[in-house]
């Protein structure tokens, strides 16, 4: 089954370097017509709530960290990892095995290809893939330049 509302992985450090857990007192909000797959984990917020909006579909074995917001009608596919405080816009497709670093903002109508690593914000209507989340159109142009010298 899925695990909904677990404490996020938030730590600070004592002066001697000992890690201490930061309490998570937020909750999660799940909209209407949401599907959440097996072995998925959605962490509750640290102070504010983690939010999954209406019509979101989350596949099996997805991890969504504390304070995230997943916009309406977005799809999150197997093994995707969304780090803390990420905001995903509406109508997005987050591909399998993709990872999004904390505090990134993903615009509306964004497609993130499988295995992508996203380390910065993405504007609306982009198709992104690759190790550093390259815009798909830019990647195709670069490939053509390399192959054909154009």
Residue ranges and their predicted role:
Residues 2-135:
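Structural signal for interior beta-strand "rungs" in well-ordered beta-sheet cores
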Residues 140-150:
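Long, leucine- and charge-enriched amphipathic alpha-helices
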